[in-house]
Amino acid sequence: LEGVCETVRDLYAERAVCYFRLKKELSKYGVRILRADELTPRQKEEARTVFMTHVLPLLSLMVLDAKHPLMQFENMKNYMLYDLERDGRHMVGVMAFNAALDRLYRIGGGEKARLVPLEELVRAFGHNAFTGYTAGGRMMMRVTRNADFDTNIDDSDVERDFSEIMKKKVESRARLNVVRLEIDREDEKLKEFVLKL
């Protein structure tokens, strides 16, 4: 496992280098992928409108507290977590991303394309969905769940319907143990919460 972790760490670093190289190359052709903090005030207002009208209606929200302490996080699905406070009580706000949402949203017109990733819109404006709460830290997360595949499948089973066997195995993954947790930044309260998964 240590070898896997070391290799994965290197692959994540390589992925980041590729992403920034691609971003730089795209900007030469007038396509810019922007973080929310890079937007002008006018662009930020347009991005907020895009979030409120096109993104927010497709997000699933939940507030976890002492009465509702945990939920089942789906395999390979993105979530934004918020450290929420109301009347001196701390809670965790969970915003689940819908697969129907676009991954990039164009802001502004003209020949040059300014694109804001879905994750940036949620990070910048998602706290508005939790009315009545004060939002503190926020953290994007995704879990990978274990998949137990039996290599001793009888040949007659495979001949009958291999796709059905695989479908059942993949579906069972939704209930299995978390083997990887990905977060985009460390917020101590939220990190403490997700480590209980």
Regions inferred by a protein language model and the residue ranges of each:
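N-terminal non-catalytic structural scaffold regions of very large proteins
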Residues: L1-L197
